[in-house]
């Protein structure tokens, strides 16, 4: 497994980075595309950091003929918005996405873009949440649980 740190904010730089990767390593077997933004000051930045970055990445891969065997896109369950809050039944693939955040909308736009592509090998994963550098929300949740603090996630209290 190798990691590629790419600049999605500059299309020309991204293309140069991918060309360099191709020279040094050849093509890709698989790409796990988990880059993106989860917090932004301006709602438009979600589209830039999630949808447009993904789209430019894929367009550049296609232009440079660097398609992987499989492109794994890390999306989010947030594309569904608040769903099944009463009975908590599982979300399924046939459910209609109804994102209620700019983040969820940007992830859904990326999924819709992928679904429109012809002959592009992709799969979409929708994790419940992410945790890593600069993403502290889930750490706070786990810390609350470890201290036996009751908390609720969601948009309203259900009795």
Listing of model-derived features with the role each one plays in the protein:
Residues 4-6:
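Cofactor-binding loops of NAD(P)H-dependent oxidoreductases
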Residues 8-51, 55-56, 82:
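NAD(P)H-binding glycine-rich loop region in Rossmannoid oxidoreductase-like domains
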Residues 9, 79, 130-132:
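Conserved sequence/active-site signature of Rossmann-fold short-chain dehydrogenase/reductase
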Residues 17-19, 45-48, 85-90, 137-140, ...:
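Short, glycine/charged-enriched secondary-structure capping and boundary segments
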Residues 50, 92, 103-107:
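Active-site YXXXK catalytic motif of short-chain dehydrogenase/reductase
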Residues 98-123:
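Active-site Tyr-X1-5-Lys
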Residues 117-159:
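NAD(P)-dependent short-chain dehydrogenase/reductase
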